Design a protein with these regions (language model features):
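A Zn2+-metalloprotease active-site environment signal
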Residues: 2-279
Length: 279
């Protein structure tokens, strides 16, 4: 029986040949930071998965009934979405903002503009500008299509792993497990985690510009990460083992971006400063 063509298997094997090549199909440039990226997943599929995941989150979690939390998150979200639209970003997003009644210090934005804020992060935000810091970071992940880029990255790693495994099976079958262990460790610490930290830093950079253009004081960005660091106790893992840069590094990087961000804030159509304080 002839072997049937499998699109996913074909992509998985062929991607390693395209490592580092952004002249190929599926390459684009990120907004604001202008970084070249490779994307093999259509944006429509990303959005479809994002909507499905968001609906599941809302079904499985208790939605906050705190009127002030819902009002602040919704208001900040609409202002950030409008600032993004003025730059022709997220124009195909159906924005939605939900507060989850959970004390976890977390927030996220799924493809398609589906934003969730957990109640636990709001006291650290302290005010509307603090909410804007977190939310502009999260929506930047979606605007830059970091989710699609991570899916492409997984295909790259899987494809290269298959090639290495095939070579090991042919050349040194008794050492196959050793080769694969070294490969998996190398890709984790040399490729996957550094790339994840790059995404986080890029979302910070995009976010401070978006919040400034939305009329929120960008000086609050480094202050938020200093507060966030202070809210955590206990020993943290070394940065090279983490998916995120350290809070201190993020605050320092954002301070370097302040001069341009302040100019954008001063040129914003409306200025809200730090906005309403969150009790």
């Amino acid at each position: 029986m002839p072997h049937q063509f499998d699109r996913r298997e074909f992509i998985t094997w062929m991607i390693p040949a395209g490592f580092g090549l952004c002249s190929c199909f599926g390459c684009r440039t990120t907004p604001i930071t202008h970084r070249s990226q490779l994307l093999l997943v259509p944006e429509s599929e990303e959005i479809q998965m994002g909507v499905a995941s968001y609906n599941e989150v809302k079904t499985k979690n208790k939605i906050s009934t705190n009127p002030k939390y819902n009002e602040v998150v919704g208001r900040v979200g609409q202002r950030l979405a409008e600032a993004a639209r003025r730059q022709n970003l997220g124009t195909n997003f159906d924005w939605e903002f939900t507060v989850i009644a959970d004390q976890t210090q977390n927030a996220f934005c799924l493809p398609g503009g589906k934003v969730a804020f957990y109640e636990g992060i709001l006291p650290v935000c302290q005010n509307e500008a603090g909410v804007a810091v977190v939310m502009s970071h999260e929506i930047s992940h979606a605007l830059a299509r970091h989710g699609g880029e991570r899916m492409t990255q997984q295909l790259e790693v899987q494809g290269a792993g298959k090639i290495i495994q095939a070579i090991a099976q042919r050349k040194a079958p008794d050492k196959e497990q050793v080769f694969m262990s070294v490969y998996n460790t190398g890709t984790k610490y040399g490729f996957v985690l550094p790339y994840s930290r790059k995404h986080e830093s890029e979302a910070d950079e995009m976010g401070i510009h978006i919040m400034s253009q939305a009329g929120y004081d960008p000086n609050e960005a480094p202050k938020f990460w200093e507060r966030f660091a202070a809210s955590h106790s206990g020993q943290k893992p070394p940065e090279f083992q983490s998916t995120h840069p350290s809070d201190e590094r993020r605050a320092a990087a954002l301070r370097e971006l302040l001069p341009q961000a302040i100019q954008e804030y001063q040129a914003a159509p409306n200025k809200y400063g730090v906005g309403v304080t969150i009790a």
